[in-house]
Amino acid sequence: MSQSPAFGPRRGSSPRGAAGAAARRNESQDYLLMDSELGEDGCPQAPLPCYGYYPCFRGSDNRLAHRRQTVLREKGRRLANRGPAYMFSDRSTSLSIEEERFLDAAEYGNIPVVRKMLEECHSLNVNCVDYMGQNALQLAVANEHLEITELLLKKENLSRVGDALLLAISKGYVRIVEAILSHPAFAEGKRLATSPSQSELQQDDFYAYDEDGTRFSHDVTPIILAAHCQEYEIVHTLLRKGARIERPHDYFCKCNDCNQKQKHDSFSHSRSRINAYKGLASPAYLSLSSEDPVMTALELSNELAVLANIEKEFKNDYKKLSMQCKDFVVGLLDLCRNTEEVEAILNGDVETLQSGDHGRPNLSRLKLAIKYEVKKFVAHPNCQQQLLSIWYENLSGLRQQTMAVKFLVVLAVAIGLPFLALIYWFAPCSKMGKIMRGPFMKFVAHAASFTIFLGLLVMNAADRFEGTKLLPNETSTDNAKQLFRMKTSCFSWMEMLIISWVIGMIWAECKEIWTQGPKEYLFELWNMLDFGMLAIFAASFIARFMAFWHASKAQSIIDANDTLKDLTKVTLGDNVKYYNLARIKWDPSDPQIISEGLYAIAVVLSFSRIAYILPANESFGPLQISLGRTVKDIFKFMVIFIMVFVAFMIGMFNLYSYYIGAKQNEAFTTVEESFKTLFWAIFGLSEVKSVVINYNHKFIENIGYVLYGVYNVTMVIVLLNMLIAMINSSFQEIEDDADVEWKFARAKLWFSYFEEGRTLPVPFNLVPSPKSLFYLLLKLKKWISELFQGHKKGFQEDAEMNKINEEKKLGILGSHEDLSKLSLDKKQVGHNKQPSIRSSEDFHLNSFNNPPRQYQKIMKRLIKRYVLQAQIDKESDEVNEGELKEIKQDISSLRYELLEEKSQNTEDLAELIRELGEKLSMEPNQEETNR
């Protein structure tokens, strides 16, 4: 057999230089993969079938020697590169030349060699592994050789298919993932729901990387890994195959499964929960798995935030995932292009968009975002614009007016508030009534009402601005019938107005508790301030009334005795004499004194309530937010402060309690004096001589100096400066994100006026309007009808149950099927009487699994835009090392394919030359024969 010139041995030196050297390098590498005559130690073996694109030149000794040298050289280089092989594989395990050639061909993308070996070499072990424990399928997937992967997947009993799938998912090889998912092992879909740890328990190496276990975490399923890697196409493919991420149980779950995992390996259990939540919080999984991704993301973000406070060791991980869910919702809102899409996200339903009879959006998703403090979502321009349009409902023209015009409107509303209330009472559905129901007008009316209330508090004290006319010890009266003490008189008209405002605010708070529920009401700190303020006002007025009642009782005694003209000559009873004493002689627990003290506290709280409306202004809003954050820092600081303060207070009291009257002042001699001295020492208002003793007890005095000095250093220099640093840090955080913080606070303020009701401000809300009475009658009618229907339904169910029991006794119902039907009916009756939590959850899920049609269309559009945007962002990244490696592997595969084609063409050419030679040799013979 003649050799082709293209593959003949190269003799002598050729002037081609580099081209010839490159050809020889390629030739040596190609022969390395095709050698079949050398054993593992380089010795000749029995001839094996030749695979690939080289013909067998067994007749050429020079070629054989050259190939042996090439094999030894390349094998030595490979072993040098894979030097630490014994660290990973068993020393007794060795590969045959055939297996090495097979693995190398799979790794480098030599498709012709792999195809021929799979077809012709029946003794080949396709599950053989290299020194790292990887088989041919794993090597082909790792180097993105799709054709080789498809060839290997056709073989039966192929191992580690699951690990190859996980590897392809981690590298983002979509076509390879689709090819592997077409494997018969994934036909039923059970494999996709099985984690590697479950496969190991079944003695299965489906997900195993090598004999030591899996490549990834034992709890990572294909869908979880795809979600981690943000592979949208792969997640979509797996979801179509039926794969889902199972939501972890509650952290405090005590089921057998959770208890067993916690006892076996608590760390692995925690990591498995985090991996599952990472998959659930992935934008790829959120956008493709849920029909209501906004609600799912909001609920999941809150759940992760709660877990961050429970599992402190993984706090940063959970907070990061929670923020990821919030960013996903913000990303969807950012992709909205019209008002309908914004309303769909904020409301969750566009077909039943209007709430109540007034056509105002319910904004259920936005309420949830405010509750879970998704600040970027609430402060987003699309959301703020929607809120602003609702805020100026029925007053759209006022939005474009200047501040001067708005101020005049506010002033006009404040002055005409009684007239506006009368109009709303008698004509709530008129044009003016609709304007009064608008959020902006409600805000202005309530703010004006509260401003009037503060004015009443100021005016109530106006009679004492220049001092009191009666001295504290004055007891003389002009007449015996004027026994009332100073300020122990009946309530003035000013105080009656204040009381009416307080009663109106109490009624408004009661309605709010009824609407929101006690839990939601107590969750808001402003409600706690209102509750405290109103409770103190009520206690003050009650104490004042008690003082007035006792004084009136004493006065009634005087009124009953008209003969009493001069009280100085009459012996009075204690109940009368007590109320004739001067103020300086009053009892400390006197109701009048208690009333005045509580009233002063309530006035301070009332003026602090102004901070509630400050977020409405862009200038004062951030300041109010910073003030609130500062108060929180002070409360945190108080824990350390009180601990240090109490320690020094008790210590100094124990040191100086034996020296009462033996000091220059009374500091530290009592607990009260110790508290005063140490408290004012924080502000530098205590004297150093507070520790000086009049006697020559220098040891005690020195101890006092040391403790007092340590206290000042600790409190003033250390703790006080630490508090200042905390306040500065909080203020800087607010300042860095002032716009978002202010818009979020403003949205919370606006939302309190979006709800229906509470149209009339205090105290006009005390008078029920005809509209309120009408709605009350409708609710009573509905409640009575529901109650009647419920009793009627209960009677029908009881009658059916009695009938079934009678039929059962008579033998009519005797089969197993009928008995099961009876038990089912009992269960249904029980569920009708008291729905279980599970049934309510199923109803909740079904409501989201079957959303309105228009809403579903809108969410599809938004999700499609989000996925496309994510793909664009991913493609816009710079070419990294992994992508360069993929290009290199593609070039390598193309090289082998071209060489195979070249080899095939060479063989065809050699065959044609041989046939042509035979024909040419036959022609002379025929001529001789003819001759």
Curated annotation (Swiss-Prot):
Topological domain ranges for the Extracellular compartment: 460-487, 543-592, 658-706
Outcome after substituting residue 143 to S: In FSGS2; increases cation channel activity; does not change the outward peak current; increases significantly the inward peak current amplitude; increases calcium ion transport
Modified residues (Phosphoserine): 815
Homology family: Belongs to the transient receptor (TC 1.A.4) family. STrpC subfamily. TRPC6 sub-subfamily.
All ranges on the Cytoplasmic side of the membrane: 1-438, 509-521, 614-636, 728-931
Official protein name in the record: Short transient receptor potential channel 6
GO-annotated cellular components: cation channel complex; cytoplasm; membrane; plasma membrane; slit diaphragm
Organism field: Homo sapiens
Impact noted for substituting residue 395 to A: In FSGS2; uncertain significance; decreases calcium ion transport; requires 2 nucleotide substitutions
